[in-house]
Amino acid sequence: MKLKKTLTYQNHTYSFLSDNTHEVLENPKEILFVKTPLNEKYSHLIAEKNLAILDFNELKNYFDFKIKIVGITGTNGKTTTASLMYSLLLDLNKKTALLGTRGFFINNERIKEKGLTTPTLLELYSDLEEAVRLKCEYFIMEVSSHAIVQKRIAGLDFALKILTNITSDHLDFHQSIENYRDAKNSFFKDEGLKVINRDETNALFNPVNAHTYALDKKAHLNVQAFSLNPSISASLCYQQDLRDPNFKEIALMHSPLLGRYNLYNILAGVLGVKLLTQLPLETIVPLLENFYGVKGRLEIVHSKPLVVVDFAHTIDGMQQVFESFKNQKITALFGAGGDRDKTKRPEMGAIASYYAHKIILTSDNPRSENEEDIIKDILKGINDSSKVIVEKDRKKAILNALENLKDDEVLLILGKGDENIQIFKDKTIFFSDQEVVKSYYQHLKQG
Protein backbone atom coordinates (compact mmCIF):
# COMPACT_ATOMS: atom_id res chain seq x y z
CA MET A 1 0.00 0.00 0.00
CA LYS A 2 1.13 3.57 -0.74
CA LEU A 3 0.41 6.13 1.98
CA LYS A 4 0.70 9.87 1.32
CA LYS A 5 3.02 11.17 4.02
CA THR A 6 5.67 13.88 3.80
CA LEU A 7 8.68 13.07 5.97
CA THR A 8 12.43 13.46 6.04
CA TYR A 9 14.50 10.32 6.51
CA GLN A 10 18.28 10.07 6.23
CA ASN A 11 18.48 13.65 4.93
CA HIS A 12 15.98 13.03 2.12
CA THR A 13 12.38 14.22 1.98
CA TYR A 14 9.78 11.74 0.76
CA SER A 15 6.15 12.28 -0.19
CA PHE A 16 4.92 8.72 0.28
CA LEU A 17 5.45 5.56 2.31
CA SER A 18 4.99 2.10 0.80
CA ASP A 19 5.39 -1.53 1.84
CA ASN A 20 5.35 -2.59 -1.82
CA THR A 21 8.79 -3.01 -3.42
CA HIS A 22 7.45 -2.49 -6.97
CA GLU A 23 5.94 0.90 -6.06
CA VAL A 24 9.18 2.02 -4.42
CA LEU A 25 11.42 0.90 -7.27
CA GLU A 26 9.24 2.75 -9.78
CA ASN A 27 9.67 6.04 -7.92
CA PRO A 28 12.44 5.79 -5.28
CA LYS A 29 12.89 9.56 -4.94
CA GLU A 30 9.29 10.09 -3.85
CA ILE A 31 8.49 6.85 -2.01
CA LEU A 32 10.20 5.50 1.11
CA PHE A 33 10.13 1.73 1.64
CA VAL A 34 8.73 0.46 4.94
CA LYS A 35 10.02 -2.98 5.90
CA THR A 36 7.55 -5.16 7.82
CA PRO A 37 7.55 -8.84 8.87
CA LEU A 38 5.27 -9.53 5.89
CA ASN A 39 7.54 -8.04 3.19
CA GLU A 40 10.93 -8.60 4.81
CA LYS A 41 11.86 -11.37 2.36
CA TYR A 42 11.62 -8.86 -0.51
CA SER A 43 13.55 -6.04 1.16
CA HIS A 44 16.83 -7.17 -0.46
CA LEU A 45 15.45 -5.76 -3.74
CA ILE A 46 15.52 -2.32 -2.12
CA ALA A 47 18.86 -2.82 -0.37
CA GLU A 48 20.52 -3.88 -3.63
CA LYS A 49 19.68 -0.47 -5.09
CA ASN A 50 21.15 1.26 -2.01
CA LEU A 51 17.77 2.80 -1.26
CA ALA A 52 16.65 3.82 2.22
CA ILE A 53 14.63 1.37 4.30
CA LEU A 54 12.42 2.43 7.20
CA ASP A 55 11.88 -0.37 9.70
CA PHE A 56 8.28 -0.78 10.84
CA ASN A 57 9.37 -0.23 14.45
CA GLU A 58 10.44 3.31 13.52
CA LEU A 59 7.14 4.17 11.85
CA LYS A 60 5.52 5.46 15.04
CA ASN A 61 8.15 8.22 15.30
CA TYR A 62 6.62 9.96 12.26
CA PHE A 63 2.99 9.89 13.38
CA ASP A 64 1.19 11.63 16.22
CA PHE A 65 -2.10 9.88 16.84
CA LYS A 66 -4.03 12.06 19.27
CA ILE A 67 -6.81 9.54 19.62
CA LYS A 68 -7.76 6.83 22.11
CA ILE A 69 -7.22 3.45 20.44
CA VAL A 70 -9.17 0.45 21.72
CA GLY A 71 -8.04 -3.02 20.62
CA ILE A 72 -10.37 -6.01 20.99
CA THR A 73 -9.14 -9.58 20.56
CA GLY A 74 -10.56 -13.04 21.22
CA THR A 75 -11.66 -16.15 19.34
CA ASN A 76 -15.30 -15.08 19.24
CA GLY A 77 -17.16 -11.87 19.99
CA LYS A 78 -14.70 -9.31 18.59
CA THR A 79 -17.06 -7.91 15.97
CA THR A 80 -20.12 -7.69 18.22
CA THR A 81 -18.19 -6.19 21.14
CA ALA A 82 -16.47 -3.63 18.90
CA SER A 83 -19.75 -2.69 17.19
CA LEU A 84 -21.54 -2.44 20.53
CA MET A 85 -18.89 -0.07 21.94
CA TYR A 86 -19.03 1.98 18.75
CA SER A 87 -22.82 2.26 19.10
CA LEU A 88 -22.65 3.24 22.79
CA LEU A 89 -19.97 5.89 22.23
CA LEU A 90 -21.86 7.42 19.30
CA ASP A 91 -25.02 7.52 21.43
CA LEU A 92 -22.96 9.33 24.08
CA ASN A 93 -22.11 11.94 21.40
CA LYS A 94 -18.48 10.85 21.15
CA LYS A 95 -16.88 11.04 17.71
CA THR A 96 -15.77 7.47 17.07
CA ALA A 97 -14.21 5.27 14.38
CA LEU A 98 -14.68 1.51 14.02
CA LEU A 99 -12.32 -0.80 12.12
CA GLY A 100 -12.79 -4.54 11.72
CA THR A 101 -14.29 -7.41 9.80
CA ARG A 102 -17.27 -5.33 8.65
CA GLY A 103 -15.14 -2.50 7.27
CA PHE A 104 -14.07 0.99 8.37
CA PHE A 105 -16.66 3.39 9.79
CA ILE A 106 -16.48 6.92 11.16
CA ASN A 107 -19.43 8.51 12.94
CA ASN A 108 -21.99 6.12 11.40
CA GLU A 109 -20.59 6.50 7.88
CA ARG A 110 -18.92 3.59 6.07
CA ILE A 111 -15.53 4.71 4.80
CA LYS A 112 -14.32 1.34 3.47
CA GLU A 113 -15.88 -2.01 2.67
CA LYS A 114 -14.94 -5.27 4.36
CA GLY A 115 -11.35 -6.42 4.46
CA LEU A 116 -9.02 -8.23 6.81
CA THR A 117 -10.02 -8.24 10.48
CA THR A 118 -6.89 -6.16 11.08
CA PRO A 119 -5.41 -4.52 7.94
CA THR A 120 -1.74 -4.16 7.02
CA LEU A 121 0.31 -1.81 9.16
CA LEU A 122 0.39 1.05 6.64
CA GLU A 123 -3.33 0.74 5.92
CA LEU A 124 -4.01 0.84 9.65
CA TYR A 125 -1.89 3.98 10.03
CA SER A 126 -3.77 5.51 7.10
CA ASP A 127 -7.13 4.76 8.75
CA LEU A 128 -5.93 6.24 12.02
CA GLU A 129 -4.81 9.42 10.26
CA GLU A 130 -8.26 9.73 8.66
CA ALA A 131 -9.97 9.30 12.04
CA VAL A 132 -7.70 11.95 13.57
CA ARG A 133 -8.36 14.30 10.65
CA LEU A 134 -12.10 13.98 11.28
CA LYS A 135 -11.50 14.74 14.97
CA CYS A 136 -12.53 11.36 16.35
CA GLU A 137 -11.93 10.87 20.05
CA TYR A 138 -11.99 7.06 19.91
CA PHE A 139 -10.77 4.41 17.45
CA ILE A 140 -12.28 0.97 18.12
CA MET A 141 -10.56 -1.89 16.30
CA GLU A 142 -10.62 -5.67 16.12
CA VAL A 143 -7.22 -7.28 16.59
CA SER A 144 -6.70 -10.73 15.08
CA SER A 145 -4.15 -13.29 16.25
CA HIS A 146 -2.52 -13.06 12.80
CA ALA A 147 -2.08 -9.31 13.26
CA ILE A 148 -0.43 -9.79 16.66
CA VAL A 149 2.07 -12.35 15.34
CA GLN A 150 2.76 -10.41 12.13
CA LYS A 151 3.17 -7.17 14.11
CA ARG A 152 0.47 -5.37 12.13
CA ILE A 153 -0.29 -3.26 15.22
CA ALA A 154 3.32 -2.24 15.89
CA GLY A 155 3.89 1.20 17.35
CA LEU A 156 0.31 1.79 18.49
CA ASP A 157 -0.36 3.01 22.01
CA PHE A 158 -3.63 1.45 23.09
CA ALA A 159 -5.78 3.37 25.54
CA LEU A 160 -7.60 0.10 26.27
CA LYS A 161 -7.25 -3.58 25.35
CA ILE A 162 -10.13 -6.06 25.64
CA LEU A 163 -10.17 -9.87 25.73
CA THR A 164 -13.42 -11.65 24.88
CA ASN A 165 -12.36 -15.32 25.08
CA ILE A 166 -9.73 -17.81 23.91
CA THR A 167 -10.74 -21.18 22.51
CA SER A 168 -9.30 -22.60 19.28
CA ASP A 169 -9.00 -21.20 15.77
CA HIS A 170 -6.54 -20.61 12.93
CA LEU A 171 -4.41 -23.64 13.82
CA ASP A 172 -3.46 -23.83 10.13
CA PHE A 173 -1.50 -20.62 10.80
CA HIS A 174 -0.43 -21.01 14.44
CA GLN A 175 0.32 -24.78 14.18
CA SER A 176 -0.78 -25.50 17.77
CA ILE A 177 -3.37 -24.38 20.30
CA GLU A 178 -0.50 -23.33 22.60
CA ASN A 179 0.90 -20.96 19.96
CA TYR A 180 -2.58 -19.56 19.36
CA ARG A 181 -3.18 -18.91 23.07
CA ASP A 182 0.28 -17.39 23.45
CA ALA A 183 -0.42 -15.01 20.56
CA LYS A 184 -3.68 -13.81 22.11
CA ASN A 185 -2.24 -13.49 25.61
CA SER A 186 0.88 -11.63 24.42
CA PHE A 187 -1.41 -8.67 23.69
CA PHE A 188 -2.00 -8.25 27.44
CA LYS A 189 1.54 -8.41 28.84
CA ASP A 190 1.98 -4.66 29.35
CA GLU A 191 0.73 -2.48 32.20
CA GLY A 192 -1.81 -0.61 30.11
CA LEU A 193 -5.54 -0.46 30.80
CA LYS A 194 -7.21 -3.75 29.96
CA VAL A 195 -10.59 -5.49 30.20
CA ILE A 196 -10.46 -9.26 30.73
CA ASN A 197 -13.09 -12.00 30.72
CA ARG A 198 -12.53 -13.44 34.21
CA ASP A 199 -14.37 -16.64 33.30
CA GLU A 200 -11.86 -17.38 30.52
CA THR A 201 -9.53 -20.03 31.96
CA ASN A 202 -7.02 -19.66 29.12
CA ALA A 203 -6.44 -15.97 29.80
CA LEU A 204 -2.97 -14.93 31.00
CA PHE A 205 -2.43 -11.21 31.55
CA ASN A 206 -0.50 -8.58 33.47
CA PRO A 207 -2.75 -7.78 36.46
CA VAL A 208 -1.64 -4.14 36.57
CA ASN A 209 -4.56 -1.96 35.38
CA ALA A 210 -6.63 -5.05 34.62
CA HIS A 211 -10.40 -4.77 35.03
CA THR A 212 -12.53 -7.88 34.78
CA TYR A 213 -16.05 -8.97 33.89
CA ALA A 214 -17.71 -12.33 34.49
CA LEU A 215 -20.90 -14.30 34.93
CA ASP A 216 -19.44 -17.00 37.19
CA LYS A 217 -16.42 -15.54 38.99
CA LYS A 218 -16.02 -12.43 41.11
CA ALA A 219 -15.13 -9.48 38.88
CA HIS A 220 -15.30 -5.69 38.59
CA LEU A 221 -18.45 -6.04 36.49
CA ASN A 222 -20.76 -8.87 37.48
CA VAL A 223 -24.29 -9.96 36.76
CA GLN A 224 -26.52 -10.31 39.82
CA ALA A 225 -29.36 -11.94 37.89
CA PHE A 226 -30.26 -12.36 34.24
CA SER A 227 -32.80 -13.72 31.80
CA LEU A 228 -32.17 -14.76 28.20
CA ASN A 229 -35.80 -15.15 27.21
CA PRO A 230 -37.03 -13.67 24.94
CA SER A 231 -33.90 -11.47 24.81
CA ILE A 232 -31.27 -10.39 27.33
CA SER A 233 -32.22 -8.64 30.58
CA ALA A 234 -29.88 -8.39 33.55
CA SER A 235 -28.98 -6.61 36.75
CA LEU A 236 -25.37 -5.42 36.48
CA CYS A 237 -23.12 -4.63 39.43
CA TYR A 238 -19.89 -2.64 39.07
CA GLN A 239 -17.21 -2.43 41.76
CA GLN A 240 -14.22 -0.22 41.05
CA ASP A 241 -12.30 -1.73 43.98
CA LEU A 242 -13.03 -5.39 44.69
CA ARG A 243 -11.68 -4.95 48.23
CA ASP A 244 -14.30 -2.32 49.02
CA PRO A 245 -17.79 -3.88 48.92
CA ASN A 246 -19.40 -0.64 50.09
CA PHE A 247 -18.94 1.20 46.80
CA LYS A 248 -21.07 -0.37 44.09
CA GLU A 249 -23.01 0.76 41.06
CA ILE A 250 -26.08 -1.26 40.13
CA ALA A 251 -28.12 -0.86 36.94
CA LEU A 252 -30.83 -2.83 35.18
CA MET A 253 -30.29 -3.48 31.49
CA HIS A 254 -32.40 -4.69 28.58
CA SER A 255 -30.97 -5.63 25.20
CA PRO A 256 -32.55 -6.93 21.97
CA LEU A 257 -29.61 -9.35 21.62
CA LEU A 258 -29.99 -13.10 22.10
CA GLY A 259 -27.88 -15.69 23.88
CA ARG A 260 -25.60 -16.10 26.86
CA TYR A 261 -22.49 -15.36 24.84
CA ASN A 262 -23.93 -11.99 23.82
CA LEU A 263 -24.32 -11.21 27.51
CA TYR A 264 -20.55 -11.64 27.76
CA ASN A 265 -20.10 -9.29 24.78
CA ILE A 266 -22.36 -6.75 26.48
CA LEU A 267 -20.34 -6.94 29.72
CA ALA A 268 -17.07 -6.41 27.82
CA GLY A 269 -18.46 -3.47 25.88
CA VAL A 270 -20.14 -1.77 28.83
CA LEU A 271 -17.06 -2.10 31.05
CA GLY A 272 -14.86 -0.80 28.24
CA VAL A 273 -17.04 2.27 27.68
CA LYS A 274 -17.26 2.94 31.42
CA LEU A 275 -13.47 2.87 31.81
CA LEU A 276 -12.99 5.14 28.80
CA THR A 277 -15.64 7.72 29.69
CA GLN A 278 -15.82 7.40 33.49
CA LEU A 279 -19.59 7.78 33.20
CA PRO A 280 -22.02 6.12 35.64
CA LEU A 281 -23.35 2.69 34.74
CA GLU A 282 -26.91 4.04 34.74
CA THR A 283 -25.95 6.50 31.98
CA ILE A 284 -24.44 3.82 29.72
CA VAL A 285 -26.74 0.84 30.22
CA PRO A 286 -30.03 2.31 28.84
CA LEU A 287 -28.29 2.86 25.49
CA LEU A 288 -27.97 -0.90 25.00
CA GLU A 289 -31.59 -0.95 23.84
CA ASN A 290 -30.48 0.97 20.72
CA PHE A 291 -28.03 -1.73 19.61
CA TYR A 292 -29.68 -4.50 17.61
CA GLY A 293 -26.56 -6.49 16.91
CA VAL A 294 -24.42 -7.12 13.87
CA LYS A 295 -25.62 -8.51 10.55
CA GLY A 296 -24.71 -12.18 10.35
CA ARG A 297 -24.22 -12.56 14.09
CA LEU A 298 -27.17 -14.47 15.56
CA GLU A 299 -29.29 -12.66 12.99
CA ILE A 300 -32.96 -13.61 12.87
CA VAL A 301 -33.81 -13.68 9.16
CA HIS A 302 -37.29 -15.18 9.58
CA SER A 303 -39.36 -15.57 12.74
CA LYS A 304 -42.10 -18.16 12.13
CA PRO A 305 -40.55 -20.65 11.69
CA LEU A 306 -37.33 -19.33 13.19
CA VAL A 307 -34.35 -19.04 10.83
CA VAL A 308 -31.06 -17.69 12.20
CA VAL A 309 -27.84 -16.89 10.33
CA ASP A 310 -24.58 -16.78 12.28
CA PHE A 311 -20.88 -16.48 11.49
CA ALA A 312 -19.96 -19.31 13.92
CA HIS A 313 -17.18 -21.38 12.37
CA THR A 314 -15.29 -22.60 15.44
CA ILE A 315 -16.29 -25.36 17.86
CA ASP A 316 -16.80 -22.88 20.69
CA GLY A 317 -18.67 -20.44 18.46
CA MET A 318 -21.03 -23.17 17.29
CA GLN A 319 -21.61 -24.39 20.84
CA GLN A 320 -22.48 -20.88 21.99
CA VAL A 321 -25.09 -20.59 19.24
CA PHE A 322 -26.51 -24.04 19.96
CA GLU A 323 -26.72 -23.23 23.68
CA SER A 324 -28.85 -20.20 22.84
CA PHE A 325 -31.50 -22.52 21.35
CA LYS A 326 -30.92 -25.70 23.36
CA ASN A 327 -34.57 -26.00 24.39
CA GLN A 328 -35.72 -26.09 20.75
CA LYS A 329 -35.49 -28.62 17.95
CA ILE A 330 -32.42 -27.54 16.02
CA THR A 331 -31.65 -28.10 12.36
CA ALA A 332 -28.00 -27.17 11.84
CA LEU A 333 -26.77 -26.31 8.35
CA PHE A 334 -23.04 -25.74 7.90
CA GLY A 335 -19.81 -26.67 6.18
CA ALA A 336 -16.16 -25.83 6.83
CA GLY A 337 -13.73 -23.50 5.10
CA GLY A 338 -11.24 -25.02 2.69
CA ASP A 339 -7.47 -24.50 3.11
CA ARG A 340 -8.03 -23.89 6.81
CA ASP A 341 -7.55 -25.92 10.00
CA LYS A 342 -8.72 -29.45 9.15
CA THR A 343 -8.47 -30.79 12.69
CA LYS A 344 -11.58 -28.93 13.84
CA ARG A 345 -13.89 -30.45 11.20
CA PRO A 346 -14.77 -33.71 13.03
CA GLU A 347 -15.25 -31.69 16.23
CA MET A 348 -17.68 -29.39 14.41
CA GLY A 349 -19.61 -32.49 13.40
CA ALA A 350 -19.56 -33.82 16.95
CA ILE A 351 -20.84 -30.62 18.56
CA ALA A 352 -23.62 -30.34 15.97
CA SER A 353 -24.52 -33.98 16.53
CA TYR A 354 -24.85 -33.35 20.27
CA TYR A 355 -27.25 -30.40 19.96
CA ALA A 356 -29.10 -30.81 16.65
CA HIS A 357 -31.85 -33.28 15.80
CA LYS A 358 -31.11 -32.77 12.10
CA ILE A 359 -27.84 -31.82 10.36
CA ILE A 360 -27.43 -30.58 6.80
CA LEU A 361 -23.82 -30.61 5.63
CA THR A 362 -22.93 -28.37 2.71
CA SER A 363 -20.14 -26.21 1.32
CA ASP A 364 -18.72 -23.10 2.99
CA ASN A 365 -15.80 -21.50 1.14
CA PRO A 366 -14.09 -24.64 -0.23
CA ARG A 367 -11.30 -22.65 -1.89
CA SER A 368 -8.83 -25.13 -3.45
CA GLU A 369 -10.21 -28.17 -1.62
CA ASN A 370 -12.80 -30.64 -2.83
CA GLU A 371 -16.17 -29.94 -1.16
CA GLU A 372 -16.95 -33.62 -0.71
CA ASP A 373 -13.63 -34.23 1.07
CA ILE A 374 -14.39 -31.42 3.52
CA ILE A 375 -17.82 -32.88 4.23
CA LYS A 376 -16.27 -36.33 4.79
CA ASP A 377 -13.97 -34.79 7.42
CA ILE A 378 -16.99 -33.33 9.26
CA LEU A 379 -18.86 -36.65 9.04
CA LYS A 380 -16.06 -38.38 10.98
CA GLY A 381 -17.32 -36.65 14.13
CA ILE A 382 -20.99 -37.60 13.69
CA ASN A 383 -22.02 -40.93 15.21
CA ASP A 384 -25.64 -41.00 14.06
CA SER A 385 -25.65 -40.69 10.27
CA SER A 386 -29.45 -41.02 10.17
CA LYS A 387 -29.83 -37.37 11.19
CA VAL A 388 -27.52 -36.14 8.40
CA ILE A 389 -28.38 -34.85 4.94
CA VAL A 390 -25.52 -34.02 2.56
CA GLU A 391 -26.03 -31.39 -0.16
CA LYS A 392 -22.83 -29.70 -1.29
CA ASP A 393 -24.68 -26.95 -3.20
CA ARG A 394 -25.26 -24.41 -0.41
CA LYS A 395 -28.27 -22.77 -2.04
CA LYS A 396 -29.99 -26.11 -2.61
CA ALA A 397 -29.13 -27.14 0.94
CA ILE A 398 -30.76 -24.02 2.41
CA LEU A 399 -33.85 -24.38 0.23
CA ASN A 400 -34.16 -28.03 1.21
CA ALA A 401 -33.91 -27.09 4.89
CA LEU A 402 -36.56 -24.36 4.54
CA GLU A 403 -38.98 -26.64 2.70
CA ASN A 404 -38.81 -29.20 5.49
CA LEU A 405 -38.70 -26.78 8.44
CA LYS A 406 -41.58 -27.12 10.89
CA ASP A 407 -43.04 -24.33 13.03
CA ASP A 408 -41.62 -25.74 16.27
CA GLU A 409 -38.08 -26.01 14.85
CA VAL A 410 -35.23 -23.54 14.45
CA LEU A 411 -32.90 -23.55 11.45
CA LEU A 412 -29.36 -22.40 12.25
CA ILE A 413 -27.39 -21.52 9.11
CA LEU A 414 -23.79 -21.31 10.28
CA GLY A 415 -20.36 -20.38 9.03
CA LYS A 416 -20.68 -17.45 6.66
CA GLY A 417 -22.64 -14.81 8.57
CA ASP A 418 -22.86 -11.62 6.54
CA GLU A 419 -20.47 -12.75 3.80
CA ASN A 420 -21.86 -12.14 0.32
CA ILE A 421 -19.42 -14.27 -1.67
CA GLN A 422 -18.52 -17.94 -1.90
CA ILE A 423 -14.95 -18.87 -2.81
CA PHE A 424 -14.18 -21.89 -4.98
CA LYS A 425 -10.92 -23.08 -6.53
CA ASP A 426 -11.53 -21.49 -9.91
CA LYS A 427 -14.14 -18.83 -9.19
CA THR A 428 -15.74 -16.55 -6.63
CA ILE A 429 -19.50 -16.09 -6.83
CA PHE A 430 -22.03 -13.81 -5.17
CA PHE A 431 -23.78 -15.69 -2.38
CA SER A 432 -25.74 -14.58 0.66
CA ASP A 433 -27.40 -16.93 3.13
CA GLN A 434 -29.82 -14.16 4.09
CA GLU A 435 -30.85 -13.46 0.50
CA VAL A 436 -31.62 -17.14 -0.16
CA VAL A 437 -33.87 -17.27 2.93
CA LYS A 438 -35.62 -13.96 2.21
CA SER A 439 -36.19 -14.87 -1.44
CA TYR A 440 -37.69 -18.23 -0.46
CA TYR A 441 -40.25 -16.72 1.92
CA GLN A 442 -41.01 -13.87 -0.47
CA HIS A 443 -41.90 -16.34 -3.23
CA LEU A 444 -43.88 -18.42 -0.75
CA LYS A 445 -45.88 -15.34 0.25
CA GLN A 446 -46.60 -14.46 -3.38
CA GLY A 447 -47.88 -17.98 -3.94
UniProtKB/Swiss-Prot annotation:
Gene3D superfamilies listed in its UniProt record: Mur ligase, C-terminal domain, Mur-like, catalytic domain
Q: Does the keyword ATP-binding apply?
A: yes
Primary location: cytoplasm
Q: Name one GO cellular component term.
A: cytoplasm
Q: Which organism is it from?
A: Helicobacter pylori (strain ATCC 700392 / 26695)
Motif Meso-diaminopimelate recognition motif, per the record, lies over 364-367
> What does the function comment of this entry state?
Catalyzes the addition of meso-diaminopimelic acid to the nucleotide precursor UDP-N-acetylmuramoyl-L-alanyl-D-glutamate (UMAG) in the biosynthesis of bacterial cell-wall peptidoglycan.
Q: Which domain of life is it from?
A: Bacteria
* Lineage summary: Bacteria, Pseudomonadati, Campylobacterota, Epsilonproteobacteria, Campylobacterales
Its recorded name reads UDP-N-acetylmuramoyl-L-alanyl-D-glutamate--2,6-diaminopimelate ligase
Give binding positions for UDP-N-acetyl-alpha-D-muramoyl-L-alanyl-D-glutamate. Answer: T21, T117, T118, S144, Q150, R152
